[in-house]
Every structure is written in C-alpha cells, then in structure tokens.
Regions:
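Membrane-interface helix termini in secondary transporters
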Residues: 42, 73-74, 78, 165
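C-terminal ends and interior cores of transmembrane alpha-helices
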Residues: 90-104
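Extracytoplasmic gate region of multi-pass secondary transporters
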Residues: 36-40, 231-264
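Cytoplasmic helix-loop-helix junction between adjacent transmembrane helices
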Residues: 113-153
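Residue-level signature of mid-helix packing/kink "hotspots" within the transmembrane helices
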Residues: 34, 62-70, 122, 156-157
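Cytosolic juxtamembrane N-terminal segment immediately preceding the first transmembrane helix
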Residues: 1-34
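Helix-loop-helix hairpin linking two adjacent transmembrane segments in secondary transporters
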Residues: 148, 152-201
Length: 264
C-alpha cells in the first residue's frame, strides 16, 4: 500500500504520545520487578531467610507471570490494550505497595503478593504490542517496539541505582511504597492520553489519522492463520529458543546479582 505524507499536524504526533506512555509502563514494570532483588538483602537479614527461602520468594513472581502472559494477549485483543495494560499496572502497583505488609504477615502472604504482582506485569508486552499494531504504520513498528523495549534496561539500571539509596535512607519498605506509587501516577496520565485505536482518540489530527489508516493494514480485522501453521515454522522455534536462553540469563542475573555482589 502506498505511503501517504504525514507532514501535517506538527512534529509531535499522537502516536508518539502513545508509545511514550507504553515506554513509561515498561519502565515502571522493571523498576517494580527489580527492586526486590536489592531489598531482599536487608529483608533476609530481618526475617532470617536462608538462600532457599529467598529463591522461592524471588521465583514466585514468575508463577503469576507464567499463568497470565498468554492470556494477556487474548485479553488485549478482546478488550483493548489501554484497558488491559492500565489494569495490569494498577494490579502490580497495588501488590508492590502491599509487599512490606505481606512480608510481615508471613511467608504465605508474601508469596501471594509476589504471584499477584506477576499476574499484573504479565499483560505488559501483549498489551503494548496490541497497541503498536493499531497505532503504528508497518514501517514504524520496529522503531516503536525498540523504543518501548528500551524501558527494560533503563528501568533496570534506575532500580539498581536508586533502590539502595532508598533502602539506606528510608528503609527497605519504602522501596516498595515509592515505586508502587509511580504506577498510580502513570495510570492517571495513561487514562487521559491513550485510546485503544486512533479512531477513538479525540485529539488526533486528521492527517495523522489518514496516514495510519493507509499504512497500518494490520490494524484491521484479519483472520489469523491456524496455530499449527505457526508451530511448524522453524523460524518461530528459533526465536522461541533464543528468547528462552536470553531471558533465562537475564532474570537469573537480575534476581541474584545484587546479593552476589553484596555477599562477595
């Protein structure tokens, strides 16, 4: 399909605001995910947790993540990425804030909070990709995905730098209170700025609307190929294996590196 000019409506496009908010969600996702890797050091000292207990606590997050991630894609397609991601951020922010209280209540409460946080965070990327599909022309999708993904290292570095300062100055509980509050502030802006589709946005320029409609054919309703066709695709399995290996290394390091450095 021929590309139309997107020269009208000024430099800043509405879709840029959408991806900026998606980036912010990914940033919040990772500061909330990583902060416990630092906070668990003083927590383990206070509650007398051995390494096995710490491993169970850190891994329980991924139980919730595993349960909801695939379902998150279905929910985003069914109800829209705005609603699903917005609720996801509120859910994981709630469980982030209550983590200290859950820890003082006992191991069952803490594990429930971590699993609940995983359930909320699992919808992040399915929802973001659903929005990118609807908001960005085909030739801009890779840049939009890359910009959103930059929230992962930026959020991780921020959490690894700022969390020790918070723990040192205010106590480990405040790492959860303050980071959880960021998600609530994000939601207020998200509700005002983002819509599921360009057609729903009250402030989008007509030129941008035409440009997206002409260059984002995937935004329409298209019948998906049968699942067995995907499962027979060698390239898909290569991506799955590479993604698994990358994530295995990444999350082991994110979970244990602060403690390794502290104990070393």
């Amino acid at each position: 399909m021929a590309e139309l000019s997107d020269s009208n409506g000024g430099f800043w496009k509405t879709r840029y605001s959408v991806i900026l908010m998606c980036f912010a969600a990914t940033f919040v996702c990772y500061i909330d995910r990583v902060n416990i890797s630092v906070a668990i050091i003083p927590m383990a000292e206070e509650f007398q947790w051995d390494l096995e207990t710490q491993g169970i606590i850190l891994s329980s997050f991924y139980v919730g993540y595993l349960i909801m991630q695939v379902m998150g894609g279905f929910l985003a397609d069914r109800f829209g990425g705005k609603i699903v991601l917005g609720l996801g951020v509120l859910i994981w922010s709630f469980f982030t804030v209550v983590t200290p209280w859950a820890a003082f209540s006992g191991m069952i409460g803490l594990l429930a909070a971590r699993i609940g946080m995983g359930l909320g965070e699992a919808v992040t990327f399915p929802s973001v990709y659903s929005l990118i599909t609807r908001w960005f022309p085909v030739h801009e999708k890779a840049k939009a995905v890359a910009f959103n993904a930059s929230g992962i290292p930026i959020g991780t570095v921020f959490a690894l730098v700022v969390t020790p300062i918070i723990v040192s100055e205010l106590g480990w509980e405040w790492a959860f209170y303050l980071f959880g509050l960021v998600g609530v502030v994000w939601y207020a802006a998200w509700h005002l700025v983002v819509t599921n589709t360009p057609e729903e946005h009250p402030r989008i320029a007509a030129a941008e609307m035409r440009y997206i409609a002409a260059n984002a054919p995937a935004a329409g309703t298209v019948e998906a190929p049968p699942m067995r066709q995907f499962l027979r695709n060698k390239a898909l399995w290569a991506i799955i294996v590479a993604h698994f290996c990358n994530n295995w290394t990444l999350y082991v390091i994110l979970s244990w590196l602060p403690k390794y450095v502290n104990d070393g």
